[in-house]
């Protein structure tokens, strides 16, 4: 008897609930009253694209099909912030009386531009050339340190160690550091005078 109960319960136990539908308008074509009703949600979502210059409802879409649209339906207004400046319903993002602040997130990482702006500053010609000349030294030092660390890792892993190359790279690094240190005081005295 217990076997019969298990057998009768197994069909109900094997029925699992349907997985959730994340985009219901793509799956409910059989349930909807008309095939166009599930397309309406997508028209609402892509209003900004139509307002931004994408083809209107009468023009062919990317797939070559035209979007179904009623002949008497006026185009919905663009969302706030889109459309011609004269028709924008929201105010400008920054009050006109205040100074404009340009958005330059990477300004910290680049040097001042050369040209009329750089020519206007009195320190532009001399320091720019010396700054560019010294900019390669940290890169070279970094490269040397990477190679030295690679040799040290080879020693640790036991894959082989070239002592001559290690000594050469160390001496080269020390030489570059000395050259950089001797230039630094010269730069400071030149900039003060």
UniProtKB/Swiss-Prot annotation:
Q: Which branch of life, at top level?
A: Eukaryota
Q: Where is this region: Disordered?
A: 1-21, 53-96, 114-136
The record's section on Pfam families has: DUF5529
Biased amino acid composition, Pro residues: 71-95
Where does the record place a coiled coil?
none
Compositional bias annotation for Low complexity: 53-70, 116-127
Specify the protein name: Uncharacterized protein C11orf91 homolog
Please name the source species: Bos taurus
